[in-house]
Amino acid sequence: MCSSVAAKLWFLTDRRIREDYPQKEILRALKAKCCEEELDFRAVVMDELVLTVEQGNLGLRINGELITAYPQVVVVRVPTPWVQSDSDITVLRHLEKMGCRLMNRPQAILNCVNKFWTFQELAGHGVPLPDTFSYGGHENFAKMIDEAEVLEFPMVVKNTRGHRGKAVFLARDKHHLADLSHLIRHEAPYLFQKYVKESHGRDVRVIVVGGRVVGTMLRCSTDGRMQSNCSLGGVGMMCSLSEQGKQLAIQVSNILGMDVCGIDLLMKDDGSFCVCEANANVGFIAFDKACNLDVAGIIADYAASLLPSGRLTRRMSLLSVVSTASETSEPELGPQANTAVDNMSASSSSVDSDPETTERELLTKLPGGLFNMNQLLANEIKLLVE
């Protein structure tokens, strides 16, 4: 048994995802950290909590147990694509109102739940963003076909609540958009975004913890699709990132109010970057492997540092040093690495009524010529990481 002192740290997650790699690793790291620091620790599942207002005061019960000593810091992992403001966010607001320090805070999570909400928060801060349109309501996709034409074709079409690269399409023309409007699911609105051609099938994932860049990973598609997500078969390797890229990721994290986040950057021909997405519930199984890091351990260290008596550990304080040192040995991202693939073209084929099961057929493919930059890059990454 670990000794207990006044400081309390909780790990709050959702039953639907608690057995996934990131949650299991964070739980392991938090337990180890709390034993090392002799901190009182508890892991809690969202649906175990009962929120109360009694005699004008906020209260909390867990499986019938009245909680009298509240946590000072709560590490939160909730499935952001399905976050419900009337349930999940209500719990997080309740804990925050009781004086708990949440990482991430509920407003920060909401900033990343909807991709267009993310852009709304980032707009006006000088953050480079691809031009993006969206709409109110659920049935206005077809109406947007003409409105979004100024973005030019091909254009990117995304579900505002999509995740892991799903429900993302590259529409070649207005007719393709019209076809999509009849096939996609309309539970959430879609956004229409200017296509960054030179970053097709490639992006940079940056993980930021406590306002510091933990590491950076170049992700590359292996089959010509636009998305480079490792969950869709993409591969990744540790890479260096320019100071401009690092500062951009930190700026995005700060604007969104994030303690832990993953920022996806698209690469431009001139070596600069623009923001693609921000992830409040960032996965890191491929990131850990590619960058030889223990992201969960870094998260646990930062959580402990937020306690009243906490301080940044050596692992956290050395992050920037490690990041700088890696640039001497890892491939650099710059204008040469960002050379555009000029001969991309869109294609379509007959599809079933469910786009998520036939997404592959709707995606733009790179032509099967003798020279396919992304395929070569992906093969090199595989050789380096295997």
Swiss-Prot record:
What subcellular compartments does it reside in? Cytoplasm
- Summarize where Mn(2+) 1 binds, as residue positions: 264, 277
Return the broad EC class. ligase
> Which of this chain's residues are annotated to bind ATP?
158, 193-203, 219
Q: Keywords of this protein's UniProt record, alphabetized? A: ATP-binding, Cytoplasm, Ligase, Magnesium, Manganese, Metal-binding, Nucleotide-binding
Per UniProt, residues of the ATP-grasp domain are 119-304
The main place the protein resides is cytoplasm
Q: Which reaction does it catalyse?
A: citrate + L-glutamate + ATP = beta-citrylglutamate + ADP + phosphate + H(+); N-acetyl-L-aspartate + L-glutamate + ATP = N-acetyl-L-aspartyl-L-glutamate + ADP + phosphate + H(+)
The record's comment on cofactor binding reads: Binds 2 magnesium or manganese ions per subunit.
Q: Which GO terms describe its molecular function?
A: ATP binding; citrate-L-glutamate ligase activity; metal ion binding; N-acetyl-L-aspartate-L-glutamate ligase activity
Question: Which parts of the sequence bind Mg(2+) 1?
Answer: 264, 277
Annotated binding of Mg(2+) 2, by residue? 277, 279
So where does Mn(2+) 2 get bound? 277, 279
Family affiliation: Belongs to the RimK family.
Main role?
Catalyzes the synthesis of beta-citryl-L-glutamate and N-acetyl-L-aspartyl-L-glutamate. Beta-citryl-L-glutamate is synthesized more efficiently than N-acetyl-L-aspartyl-L-glutamate.
- Give additional notes from the record: N-acetyl-L-aspartyl-L-glutamate (NAAG) is the most abundant dipeptide present in vertebrate central nervous system (CNS). Beta-citryl-L-glutamate, a structural analog of NAAG, is present in testis and immature brain.
The record ties this protein, via PANTHER family, to: BETA-CITRYLGLUTAMATE SYNTHASE B, RIBOSOMAL PROTEIN S6 MODIFICATION PROTEIN
Name recorded for this polypeptide: Beta-citrylglutamate synthase B
What is the originating organism of this protein?
A: Bos taurus
What phylogenetic lineage does the species belong to? Eukaryota, Metazoa, Chordata, Craniata, Vertebrata
